[in-house]
Amino acid sequence: MIRFVQIHGLQLVRHNSTISTISGKIQNDIRLMIDQKTPRAFLKQNSNSTKELVKILDVVDKPDEIKPIKRLLMKKFKQNYSPFINKLRDASENPTKLHLTYIKQIGQEYRVLFNKYIDEIISNNEIDTIDKKNCIYEMINLQNELYPTIGEKYGWFLTDKIHKWFWENIDKNESFTHYYFLIQNNVNLSSSYHILQFQKRLLKGSQLEFELASFQLFLHKPEYEHIFRRKFIILNSFDSIRSFVNLLIQKNDLRFLRMYFNSMLDSMKRPSFKTNPDTVEFDSRLNLIYFNISLLNYLSKIEDIKMFSSTLRILANETSKIQTNELNKDNKIRLSNISNLLLSPLSSSITLLRNKGMYDEAFDLLSLMRKTPMVHNSVFKNFLIGHLISCLRSFNDPKLSLQYVTSAYRRKRVALFLNQLGLWGWVYHGKSYTLSNQELDTEYQKIKNTLPRSMVSIQYPPLPVLTELYITVLNTFSKTMDKENFKVFLLDLYQRYKKTILPMRSHNLYFQQNTGILNAFLKHVRYSINDHLLSLTILKDFYNESDSHRFKPTDGTSPFSIVVYQNEKLSNRDISKVLELMDSLEIPLDFKFCVAMVYHYHSRNNIPEALVWYKKILDSKFNVEHMGLIKLITENGWEYPDHFDMKLLENLDEQKQSSTEEEDFLISNTKEDLETEAPTEATTDSEMIIKEFQAMISNTNHVLKKPLLD
C-alpha cells in the first residue's frame, strides 16, 4: 500500500510495508487457533500447530495487522512468550524477520538482529537493487510502526554499511524522497559518514532540498511545526544542528533562528550516542563553547557589538577554564578547531569596530582573546596580531606599528628582514637607509619586549600582517610628505620590496604570496601621486620578474583592476598588453576588472565593446550593486542581471561617487586588508531575538552540572 503526504505544497510518496493484502478475518482465525489449544501444544518439538500458525504470520506484513496479533499472542503465552517466539522463528521461512516483528522487548539483541537482517538483504545477489531498496524500506517502516515510542524518544540508528548502500544505489534525484522517508520513520540523520553525505548533498542542492535537510521545511506552516519540535533534536546531533544554524546565518536567513538556538540548547542536554565516558565533561564544555560561537556569528551578522562583547566574555571564561595540559591529542585538536571557527565572527566584529572608529572596544576584544588557550594556535595568534596592527593604523604612527610587529615576531631575523625591506630605515630614520647589524641590534633590543610572551610568534610576519604594516607606513607618509618626495619614498620602498621578497625560497612567505602589498603601492601611485601611467609601469615591471607568477590576486581586488579602473591615461594598446599579461599568468577576470573595462570603452564611446564586457559580468553571475555601473546599464538600456535588486534604481539620482568612493570600491573587501563585507539587513526582529538570547546566555552554564577541568 502507498500513501501520499502533502507537505509545503509537495506531494511525497510514503512507503508502507505491504506485499499482500490480508483480510481482517486473519485476526479471528488466529484467535480461534490459539484458543482451541494450550500453550504447551505450540511449544512441543516439531509442533504442527506452530507450523500452521507460522504460515499465517509469515504473510502478515501490515503493521496495523501485526500489532493486535502480537498483543493477542503476548496475552495468551505470558511468561512463555519468548520460548514461543523461538519456536515460531525455528519454523519460519523468514526467521530473522519474524523474530524482529514479534520480539517482546527492544534491546541490544534486537539492534544486532535488525542490522544483520538488512545486511543479509544487501548481500543477497538474487534480489535486484529496486527490490532490495523496497525490502529495506519495508523493515525500517515496520520497526517504526511497531515500536513508535522507541523511535520518537530515541530515533533509530542504522549502520554505516546500510547508509553506504543507500548512497551508492539511490539515484541522486531521489535523495530528497529518501531523506524524507528517513525523517518519517525516525531514522537518525547524524550517526554515520554516509548519512551525513546525504545531508551535505541536500544542503548544497535546491532551496527545497536545503530546507528539508535543515528541517526548515516544517516551519513554514503552523500545522507542520510539530514535526520540527518532535523530531529535530532526536534525529540530528548537536554538531548537525550547529552547522544548520551557521549556514542559515551565512545565508542571512534569520526567520526561525530562535527555534534553532533553542534546539541547540536542548540538544546539549541530551546524551550523545557518540559520548565517550572519559571525555564527557570536556565534550559538554566544548558544546557550550560551540553554542556561543554560533551566537557570536549571529551577533556579528546583525552588528550588535554590545551583546557580542558580552557573549565573547562568556566564551573566553569557558575556554580559560580548560586545562590544555590535561587534554589528550584528539581533544587538543578539537580545541584548536574552535580557534578557527571563531576567526570569522571575531574578524567581522573587530573590522566593524575599526570602521566605526571604536578602537578602544576593538582593543578590549583582542585583549580578551589573548588570555584564552586559543592563543596557542598559531593561526589564531597571527589573526590577533594582524587585527592589532590593523587597529594601530588609527594612530597614524608607523613607529608604533613597526615596534609591535617586531615584538610580536620576536626573532632577530625578522628585524633583519624589515631592515632589508627598507621599512626600518624609513620609519625610524626618515630616509632610505640600511642599518649595520650592530646598529640594528642596539635598536632591536630596546623594543623587542613590547608585547607579552603569549602574543609572540616564532614565524616571519604573515602577509596580512606585513600588508597592514605597509598600508600604515604608506598612508602616513603620503600625508606628511609632498608629492615628489613621497614618489621617491614609494619607489625606493617598492624596489626594496621586490628585491627582498621575490627571491625568497627558505620560509613560509614563499608559499603564501599574494598581491596585498603590491595593491597598496599601486593605490598610492594612482590616488596619492596621481601618476596613472606609472601604475602600469610598476605592474609590468613586477610581473616581468622571474618569480612573480607566484603572486596571485586574492578574493578581493587584483592589481590589474587598480591599474585599469577609470584610468583615462591608458590607450587601447595598453589595455591589450594588460590582458595579454593576465592571460599569460592565468589570472581570471573579476568583477572589478570587468567594471573597469566597461568604463574604459564607454568613456571612449565604444558602446559595443563596453556591452561585450558587461555581458561578461552577466555570464559570470556577479552581484551588481555598483551604482556607477547601474547608471550606465540604465542609460544604455541594457538588460539588468538576474535577481537584480530594482530598489537600487530609486537611489540612482542621489548617487554621485567621489574619487574616495571609487578608491574604496577598488581596495575594500580584500583579504589582505582583513576586511569583511557588511551584512545585509536582518530579516527578523533582532531585538526580540537578542532578549531571548540574553536569557539563553544566562542559563547556558546550567547545562553543565559542575565546573569542568577547573
UniProtKB/Swiss-Prot annotation:
* Region called Disordered, residue ranges: 657-683
Key words, A-Z: Membrane, Mitochondrion, Mitochondrion inner membrane, Transit peptide, Translation regulation
> Where found in the cell?
Mitochondrion inner membrane
Transit peptide range is 1-15
Does the record carry Mitochondrion as a key word?
yes
Query: Membrane topology for this entry?
Result: Peripheral membrane protein
Superkingdom, according to UniProt? Eukaryota
**Keyword Hydrolase listed:** no
Q: Which GO terms describe its biological process?
A: regulation of translation
- What GO CC terms are in its UniProt record? mitochondrial inner membrane
Name the job this protein performs: Translation factor specific for subunit 6 of the mitochondrial ATPase. Required for assembly of the CF(0) component of the ATPase.
Question: So what family is this one in?
Answer: Belongs to the ATP22 family.
Task: Indicate what this protein is called per its UniProt record.
Answer: Mitochondrial translation factor ATP22
Q: Which gene encodes it?
A: ATP22
